[in-house]
Amino acid sequence: MSGELLRFGEVAIAVHASSESTGGALSLFEELPPMVDTPLHVHSKEDELFHVLEGEHVIEVGDREFRIWPGGTVFAPRGIPHAQRRVVPGEGRLLILTPPGGFDGFFRELAAAEAAGTLGPDAYAAASEKYGITWL
């Protein structure tokens, strides 16, 4: 277990299993309050599995919308547009699994940009391109 806490903007991510610690098999992380909504986007390199720990969430995957509560899980395959939001803004916790590993690097780069004072549209664009994320 990594135990790494990454912060950038209003985002807080606890990395439970990094790509490095799993030999590249997966990344496992938790989004912590005050969670922000994630707009529609596509991953080209990994699948994404959302598991609700706290709060009520709406996960869009393709043309389907799932309203889920603690214990609920939704799978978003790579290449399919998806988004997530909380029913009560700012509340909730999500455990997110992304196989194969590597996606934790996206958050690590944004946290480094925050620490360096360079977090902004250019940092998001560079990290998104590097990690195969297209924002729609």
Across the structure, where does each feature detected by a protein language model lie?
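A short glycine-rich, His/Asp/Glu-containing loop-to-beta-strand
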Residues: L5-L40, E46
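Structural motif
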Residues: A12, D37, L49, E56-V58, ...
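Short acidic-glycine-tyrosine-enriched beta hairpin
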Residues: S21, E56, D63-G79
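Short, conserved beta-strand element in jelly-roll/cupin
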Residues: L28-P34, V42-E60, L97
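Residue-level recognition of conserved beta-strand positions in structured domain cores
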Residues: E30, V42, V61-D63, P70, ...
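Ligand-binding loop in jelly-roll beta-barrel domains
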Residues: R78-D104
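Acidic/histidine-enriched, glycine/proline-rich intrinsically disordered or flexible terminal extensions
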Residues: R108-L136
